[in-house]
Amino acid sequence: MSSLWTENIEMPEFPTLEKDIRTQVLIIGGGMAGVLCAYFLQQAGVDYCLLEKDRICQGVTGHTTAKITAQHGLIYEKSLQSMGQERAELFLKANLRAVENYKNLGRFLDCDMEETDSYLYSVRERRKLESEIQALGSLGFQADYTEDTELPFEVEGAIRFPRQAQFQPLKFAAGISKNLRIYEHSEVREMTEYFALTEKGSVAAEKIIIATHFPFINTRGSYYLKLYQNRSYVLACAYGKNLKGMYLEADNIGLSLRNYEDYLLIGGGGHRSGKEKNNWDLLRDIAKAVSYTHLRAHETRSN
């Protein structure tokens, strides 16, 4: 399924693996995570290769809202409670450092990288926002609490993370992957601890990174028995309101909003596949209420 990101973008093409090779690190999976692993390994002078069963960055990466932020919901109070002070601080710092790394890379790529603030808002749960602010403060991060947003509806409040970013993910991926050692249309059929077999070749590696959307091999935990498919949606609304920032709802259906060119992107409506109740119609109603003209839609899947 096409998306706003896949239009008018020509991704680099890579050969199929048709021989037996050896390398220090094998990466399996060519989404954003796998491509970035390959990039940083190359920067560090490590011998590597990446195997992708189809084309790179055509899954979630090509159908995302494409926000770069350390805000992923009300997570830091929970992290503090479950991890303790030291680990929660490291978790927050790692997220913030990743945002800066993305921005630094984006400065050298034609990927519509834009620094902007990110807001986590709630229409009814002020107390939860206040608790999250307190947790962030105890972790050494000064986030702002505000009741003044650019949203076209009233909110109880919002937590602002300054200097986050948004971008065009496929432009970013196209630019960063051009000189990487990647093999496309090279699905891994069999695998051991240090070896991967494809239809036409094989890779022997000292280390293997599995960067697929879900673990495609049976590892400890038997995750293949526990996985189920979730679906969520992103609507691209032409000539929608300019929000001057990125927004994520802390409750209800996890509404996500950001602008790109003349579009307002509205994401959310997540639900378990196969369930009678889903939030697609609700998401469309919200989109019609906050945008001015026609809608375009695509669907994302997660497990």
Regions picked out by a protein language model, each given a short descriptive name:
Residues 1-23:
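Extreme N-terminal leader/targeting segments of oxidoreductases
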Residues 25-49:
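N-terminal Rossmann-like FAD-binding beta1-loop-alpha1 element of flavoenzymes
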Residues 71-147:
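Dinucleotide-binding Rossmann-like beta1-alpha1 core, especially the glycine-rich loop
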Residues 159-194:
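Helical element adjacent to the flavin cofactor pocket in flavoenzyme catalytic cores
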Residues 191-260:
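Flavin-dependent oxidoreductases
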Residues 293-300:
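Conserved small/polar residues in nucleotide/adenosyl-binding loops
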